[in-house]
């Protein structure tokens, strides 16, 4: 057995995993072995610091942090040094960056943003009172502890008040321009306190809006916007916070609000709690110089050895606690971090337990890292552990998830050879795996093995897995045979079984069979239909265009004791839209209000798509506005509908503006939306702008174009009588690993034909000539027909005249598209 990797120590601190890196060193986690408390250890390379003449800045940073003792500022505990390294021991902050919280969760409500802003002002006010100015405040430099309290970090750019010029102003520009005050960018000297306050205002705006107040791809334009405070607050902010933001983001530092004035602001004072802490006495800064002295005094020694407890065959506390942490991270959707913790355990010389290995398998499965699963069993055995049933089941499940059933069966056989008895869960996993890849005969063989060889009783999960597998193959009769077979073993079908069968009937266009057969059998077996059962049947009728049947069953739901949910109403709306019956849509939305079901983004998107498809972007915009006023954030699908609609309506500039809207709501554009915008510009004959969008997508955004993107551009160049440019795109396609099809080549050929070239040799000659000659007068902006991307399946405009408007009442969508309908409407006959 190979020797475990050593554990490293700096003084009393046991060094852990790498957290981050910079030009001059690394940041690692560590543990104070005397107290057991976690710390962060900044390890700086002394030679690099001296070589780059950074010694004074490092001394200044240490001096500043020694001056500060505040609950909302990262604390410095101790500074140590060896001959080659400087060790700065800092408070360990476990909650991550405020920037990541905004990126992952989006904008905050005012109460949450207010709490963070109050803590930020507390910290900044304290630092300013000590003569310390940050000058680089931004969400990336604000950390959150385990209780989600804010901690200001990153003191590398701080300037002490003693370093001001003769005019009392600072003259060193630093920090992120997005958060920098106008006077900092203008480099005319500035007051550090007022500059920090501007940054606080930008941070408050970002917390509440989810995007920056000043944005532009051009740095010159961005500076102009910042210098003139050219921004607007989003409509959802209260007047109190709007007024405060405007007073903070005052471009004139002389009239800008001050911290004492902020502390008296009505919005700020709500639930305000001043920081409580013990004031630090004047720090002794004399020892800071000793950090760079080349003497043996005070140097720390590194020591290393494997974990004694683990080597003795007992699981140590570190392994137990970190395994628990791994489980927590996996549950929160962070398997990569769990995997990293496992690697750290190995690096530190610990011996993981079987539970730790099982947790690792779960993390690998979530990350879809399946290649090392088979070798994992050998590693467990080499560590002197015997794999148990739980570990085998986890590895079999991972192999099955990857689609590698051969590997799963090898592990299954190894499981039996090792003396571990397979469980019902083992067989269910294998049966499901073979069912997913369509090998149902193998699933049946495993069921027989389960019953015959292992004497195991199948359960309801076994039944549902097999029923689902046969239904996926559209072999409903075989699925029923499974139900009957399971009943003979005492396994009764449950609501999941019947829902699967109902969905299978609806999928083949036999929703009436689903209703006539499934519902009676459910009631006979004393299985209560749920909203999913009813939703499947309603949606099935809607998909088949049988709206009267859908409505009839909608009212039958009351008899079954099932309350309709949003899926049911969205299905009805979509069904009526598919047959161009806007009156039906209006009454369904009224029913939503009657049943107390609020619309969601799918509801709005469905209605937006209906109007967008017929070219009525005004109606589409009205619904979009209603959605925003109702407090519902649009998703990628809603934005895609807008972009596609504008492009199809010949308004590509509006389609491109959608990208700004998406950024405000924290929605990342995908290749589909960019392709729709490109298609709009191609249809307008604006190939230069189409290529600008294409380059932005590939370069700045980092998205990979797909075949549709390239074929849209090729079609556009063909319509613009520039087929040589279309042909040049083939090189881009090769570079992006996008394989052209017969259709791609036909589009290029059509482009050449449009300028009278049908021979490939002539095309090559002309292409070379066009790309090198400036004398040929070929217009770039030629009026063209719509792109093929938007001609597919365009519905005819509905004949019904819509007289009413879309609007909101009490945050519910109230669409009132009645056109000569009675008071009760057509639904009265079903009441």
UniProtKB/Swiss-Prot annotation:
Keywords, in A-Z order: Repeat
Gene3D superfamilies: Tetratricopeptide repeat domain, Transferase(Phosphotransferase) domain 1
Signal peptide: none
Residues in Protein kinase domain copies: 13-268
Repeat positions for PPR: 318-352, 353-387, 388-422, 423-457, 459-493, 494-529, 530-564, 565-599, 600-634, 635-669, 670-705, 706-740
Ion transport found in the keyword field: no
Superkingdom of the source species: Eukaryota
GO molecular function annotations of the record: ATP binding; mRNA binding; protein kinase activity
Pfam families: Pkinase, PPR_2, PPR_3
Gene Ontology CC entries for this record: plastid
Similarity comment text for this entry: In the N-terminal section; belongs to the protein kinase superfamily. Ser/Thr protein kinase family. In the C-terminal section; belongs to the PPR family. P subfamily.
PANTHER family: OS01G0228400 PROTEIN
Comment, domains: The protein kinase domain is predicted to be catalytically inactive.
Name of the protein described by the UniProt record: Pentatricopeptide repeat-containing protein At5g21222
